[in-house]
Amino acid sequence: MATTYLTLVNNVLNELNESELTASTFANSRGVQTAVKKFVLKAMHEIYSTLQEVPDLYISTKQDTQVGQRVYDLPTANSPQTGDAEYRKIDYDTFRIVPKELVTNGEFTSAITSWTTGSGSPAYNSGGNGRLRLNAAAAYQSLSTVKNVQYRLQVRLIDSSSSGGNLKVLVGTSAEASDVLNETLAVTDFGAGNILNTTFTATAATTFITLDNDNSTNLDVDYVRISEDTGIKKLKYITYDNWASRFLETDLENSSEHYGLPELVYTTQDKKFGLHPIPDKDTYTVEYEYWKVHTDLSAATDTMDLNDRFKDVIITRAKYYTYVLRSDPQAAQMALAEYKLQLQILRSEYINTKAYMRDTRVHVNA
């Protein structure tokens, strides 16, 4: 359970032999109580700034590209994806281009929304990470595709009733049509399920995926994934100065001749990221990882973004600030030494990764 602002403050007050606060008196604190509230926040800010790459602040996000758009905003609240937050540090080593996922709610995480009933009564099943249950039922969804482009389709099926039933996987230019693809997926290993991996070529700008179980037995679809049949490409990071000296003239020229699959990513001078070459498709997705800015505590019941293991480090640092306020240098030095030791232990156990050597030499045949 995450530690509340009130708990942190009272832990410091308790060790200082001062009167503690309650939820009802927290907003009306006085004297040393108010000072400790400020010192707890100050301690948290210092820890965030010192460690930065705290797992509790980690977020992974994605940005869809647009044809001809070179620069994109870095994360802010609920942008580019719902759940995003203002960033503190971007991990540019994680930028990669992945094919854009076309299916909406293809993982069935909490519901079967975005799917239309074709026949029967498709239902949600909470098994696994969430599944679409079909019992004498069918469901379909329309997708935006590009004519003559090849797409990769993956479907995982679980035979919940161990009946040996078959699932029809249909792709067509209308709901429940099979003019593009007609596959039958069966499960023989009832414990593990079965996965369909196949490809199809779109024949229109709108394509329909249909999942159909004609039998009165339970078949659960674990996930449906459709994207362009292209691989994942890691982007190399370069500095803005490097981009400006090498590619500025090409990228700023009013011509689409230089558009293509991005290979490089760089930070602009106005807190955005740029891609080179400029994307030539809307069907790329840029995925990357970052650490968000923490949320300051205000009310007594507010909880910190950090893991509870950070509680003692925050308390010790807040004690140090209080001892300095009280002009008690001996106690302050003891608290400082304890804080440094706690922070070092926490960093090694919680954040530092195992070190290893990697050979980056390139072998050239003589």
Residue ranges and their predicted role:
Residues 1-105, 187-191, 223-366:
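Glycine-enriched, solvent-exposed interface loops adjoining structured elements
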Residues 7, 11-14, 20-21, 25-29, ...:
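Polar, enzyme-active/binding microenvironments
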